[in-house]
Design a protein with these regions (language model features):
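Short proline/glycine-enriched turn/loop segments at secondary-structure junctions
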Residues: 208-214
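Short, His- and charge-rich active-site/binding loops that engage polyanionic ligands
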Residues: 84-104
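Tryptophan-anchored aromatic micro-motifs
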Residues: 31-44
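Internal, hydrophobic beta-strand segments that form the core of beta-sheet-rich folds
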Residues: 195-201
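Bacterial Sec-dependent N-terminal signal peptides
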Residues: 1-23
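Amphipathic/hydrophobic helical signal segments and adjacent flexible N-terminal regions
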Residues: 3-4, 21-28, 43-57, 73-86, ...
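Hydrophobic/aromatic beta-strand elements that line small-molecule binding cavities or substrate pockets
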Residues: 55-56, 60-70, 79, 100-101, ...
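Short helix-loop boundary/capping segments
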Residues: 129-183, 202-207
């Protein structure tokens, strides 16, 4: 009887610890929302090819609004919206930027392979116990990369780490042909002033039937410094108006991804990229949005 009571006490204690940990995780994820002055900084570091010459360092910055697009007990969707014209208004003043979804104890991933192909991967439930999968999506809500890891709350720090294969970043998508996979080492950490996306990346050339070839390594530091929400009012107004349209886009992609199979998409149709087609739509053109997404899916 005493043993049973001990097991019951241990079970209750474990459940309470898990719930407390989960609440800290959710708080950390939501701490990334708000209006931010963002600086993007990238520098190539270690060269793996003898005749390779390092490219110039990349630096850029912008105002960015991050908001909870949708939320359920085991999923939080954070939408990023860049402000490209602070004096403008509507969709001409913003870029509907990337999205990060966080799923608790998720077992289903679409892992980037190369080109415009993602492989479906099923993880054992025991391997993701207590973990959160970060699923990153492109400006058109197509998948980009996914990685799973545990939020750590220790010694006054709050951070999450994972690694993931990803397509080329937008800053090099049209200028680089010497590599086709960016292996991202992601570290996201929360501070009182905002948060940081710290990256240790490898630029990889991937070919069928051959081992991956590392071209060069890269260090990335993205600083998200919190500012007054009023500075992002343009993005907030845009999202209030257009969020139903983008919800339709997300749902259309989700329907395809829920099939739990490999995915291939075409980068453009008749030389027009999907995000450009989607940005032309008005807030109530949900049917047209759904049809557009399906047109870009190969299988």
């Amino acid at each position: 009887m005493k043993a049973k009571n001990l097991f019951a006490i241990l079970a209750v204690g474990t459940a309470m610890f898990t719930q407390a940990q989960n609440q800290k995780d959710v708080k950390a994820i939501k701490a990334m929302t708000g209006c931010y002055d963002v600086s993007f900084n990238f520098a190539e570091t270690f060269i793996h090819q003898k005749e390779y010459e390092k490219k110039k360092n990349y630096r850029s910055g912008a105002l960015e609004w991050i908001t909870v697009a949708e939320e359920s007990p085991k999923k939080i969707e954070l939408q990023h919206i860049l402000i490209v014209n602070p004096q403008g208004s509507g969709k001409d003043a913003i870029v509907k930027h990337w999205r990060q979804d966080w799923k608790f104890e998720n077992t289903d991933l679409h892992v980037f392979d190369k080109g415009s192909q993602w492989k479906f991967k099923k993880l054992p439930a025991e391997s993701v116990k207590g973990q959160w999968t970060q699923m990153v999506y492109q400006v058109d809500d197509a998948p980009r990369y996914s990685g799973t890891g545990t939020w750590v709350h220790l010694d006054g720090r709050t951070y999450w780490e994972s690694a993931a294969d990803a397509p080329l970043p937008r800053r090099e998508y049209t200028t680089r042909k010497d590599y086709n996979v960016l292996v991202r080492g992601n570290h996201q950490e929360i501070f009182d002033w905002g948060w940081i996306h710290d990256q240790d990346n490898k630029k990889i050339l991937r070919k069928d039937g051959a081992a991956d070839e590392t071209i060069v390594e890269e260090k990335g530091l993205e600083y998200y410094k919190k500012v007054d929400d009023a500075k992002c009012i343009i993005a907030q107004n845009y999202w209030k108006e257009y969020s139903p349209l983008w919800k339709t886009v997300r749902q259309t992609w989700d329907e395809e991804l829920a099939k739990n199979k490999d995915l291939s998409v075409t980068p453009d149709v008749e030389d027009i990229f999907l995000y450009k087609d989607l940005m032309k739509l008005t807030p109530k053109q949900n049917k047209e949005a759904k049809e557009l997404v399906k047109k870009y899916i190969v299988n």
